[in-house]
Amino acid sequence: MAGSQIKIPLPKPPDSDSQRLNAFPVIMAQEGKGRLLRQIRLRKILSGDPSDQQITFVNTYGFIRATPETSEFISESSQQEVTPVVTACMLSFGAGPVLEDPQHMLKALDQTDIRVRKTASDKEQILFEINRIPNLFRHHQISADHLIQASSDKYVKSPAKLIAGVNYIYCVTFLSVTVCSASLKFRVARPLLAARSRLVRAVQMEVLLRVTCKKDSQMAKSMLNDPDGEGCIASVWFHLCNLCKGRNKLRSYDENYFASKCRKMNLTVSIGDMWGPTILVHAGGHIPTTAKPFFNSRGWVCHPIHQSSPSLAKTLWSSGCEIKAASAILQGSDYASLAKTDDIIYSKIKVDKDAANYKGVSWSPFRKSASMSNL
């Protein structure tokens, strides 16, 4: 069995607003009891290269409702029936060109018609049927997808509430728009992330998030207590890359060797909302040959949190969070090596203070004037 962990104590990056992801505030409509106002959250994450094209990631949060039943006769004075909320839901519209007018985006949501169905293969799945989307998003990824199939636990808050024999519709309430550089849009193929080999060592990344919640809340029971008393701490892991095993028997492949590799990569971590809450990692230095497939040509990679921890990702739909710390961990890649070796931890992962919070750029995303009732 592995012995105790070897940790390299290094200073934590200075505190900054850029380490935070803010939750949407709850603003109720004055008319219509219990109705939330539609809102937009706007964020910019740029690579720093002026030649890099800008795009927008549009991510939506809302609620699944049963489709209203229609009667035989309908008059013009009939009011549209609003069915009760069944559960919360997230759906990404993907990447597309830069969008400008926030109020236009909110009004365009009335043109959305997305049906929801439950199915199963080896596990439960959700099928989104895209019947109609606003013309404003015609150049975004969702316009090319008539059907979107996904694991139910990643996109639906409480999939157990969806039952057979009921038609469901997805109603968008919150719109998260991230203006970013095109070079940031890179994810590692799942087969590469899942592959393990005795010929390499695996580099994992642990990000500690301070989640905004009350100590006596239900979600706090599944997290660690924050020693600073400012919320709860959640740990999420990603497979970052692989490093080739050194074969020089005269060299010590210890924490100093690993720290040197990480230091040369100059790793920086930030958080954004792209495919839902997403951790972004940038390698600004030398990337070893074995690690290059895990980054794009400009050293960026995105890791959606719902791929690693669906339950934590769903918590972040409605709760703010802050990056407390990030570490890289060197492990054996294959399970036999993993069980026999210690974890070597490198804690000097920078938090990008310009790309880890959600601030309004030139307008306030939380004004009521930029909101409409979620009809």
UniProtKB/Swiss-Prot annotation:
Q: Record's Pfam families?
A: Matrix_Paramyxo_C (PF23765), Matrix_Paramyxo_N (PF00661)
Question: In which domain of life is the source organism classified?
Answer: Viruses
- Entry GO CC: viral envelope
Q: Name one GO biological process term.
A: virion assembly
Q: Which InterPro entries match?
A: Matrix_C, Matrix_N, Matrix_Paramyxo_C, Matrix_Paramyxo_N
Q: Which GO terms describe its molecular function?
A: structural constituent of virion
Q: Where in the cell is it found?
A: Virion
Keyword Ubl conjugation tagged: no
Alphabetically list the UniProt keywords: Viral envelope protein, Viral matrix protein, Virion
Which family does this protein fall into?
Belongs to the morbillivirus/respirovirus/rubulavirus M protein family.
Please explain the role this protein plays, according to its UniProt record. Answer: The M protein has a crucial role in virus assembly and interacts with the RNP complex as well as with the viral membrane.
Give the protein name, as stated in the record.
Matrix protein
Species the sequence originates in: Mumps virus (strain SBL) (MuV)
